[in-house]
Amino acid sequence: MKKREIKKICLLYLQIIVFYSIMVSSMRRGKHHSKKKGELKIIKRANPFGKKKINRGSKSHSLLYLKNCELRNSGRRNTHLRDLFDHLSGGQPLRDSNIEEYHLTPKLRKTVQFFQALPNDPYRKSQEVILLGRKCPPMPEELKNRGCQSTVYVHPTVEDREGKKIIAWVGDSDGLLTKGIVYILVDGLSGYPPEQILRVNPNFITLTGISEFLTMSRINGYLNIMNKMKAFSTSIMQNGER
């Protein structure tokens, strides 16, 4: 009897040990599997879009860089324009935004204030310049002024008003933007004596914002027209003094 009981007890212990080992191994497998799932979930939450998320970040970064680059380039362009105007306009430097410092005629002052009241949008301002150019009457070809990207016509006439010489200007051009600039000058400087025309600082164009979208050739053409108008005004003054 004792031997049989001992065998039964041994078998029972063996069954318990086997069952316990099976349970332990299964529990370990379950924990390992659940841990992998947890890791996968964490990875998916951290980067749900995979590579697309990285691409979006790099794209926004590149756009930000381009925007900053444009701002830096615009600053350099403004500095270059100031130096160019200072060099080509007879050493008349740019001053503050105070309009009084430019000795403008009443017509030019009105034009500057008109463009300053517009939104700071180069396209909008360029369209306004083109619209002003439509007011220029046609002119004969023999009156053209060279030195600009487009063919330009500028012609003065002198009138005597109460013993004073008054200059009137007409102008035209085959370029849309240049034609508008010609109109600004001939309209703004017509009806005034040569002394008043000579006092006008040609850098006033920077107050309007027009110079921001002009090419270098058009800027040179603008200053060439101003130089011709001032040269004629000087000759009128010299002839009047003789």
UniProtKB/Swiss-Prot annotation:
Q: Which Gene3D superfamilies match?
A: 3.90.1010.10
Q: Known InterPro entries for this protein?
A: Fe-S_metab-assoc_dom
From which domain of life does this come? Eukaryota
Q: Which SUPFAM superfamilies match?
A: SufE/NifU (SSF82649)
Kindly give the Pfam families that the UniProt entry links to this protein: SufE
Q: Which family does it belong to?
A: Belongs to the SufE family.
Query: What do we know about how this protein assembles, alone or with others?
Result: Monomer. Interacts with SufS; interaction enhances cysteine desulfurase activity of SufS.
Question: What is the name attached to this protein's record?
Answer: Cysteine desulfuration protein SufE
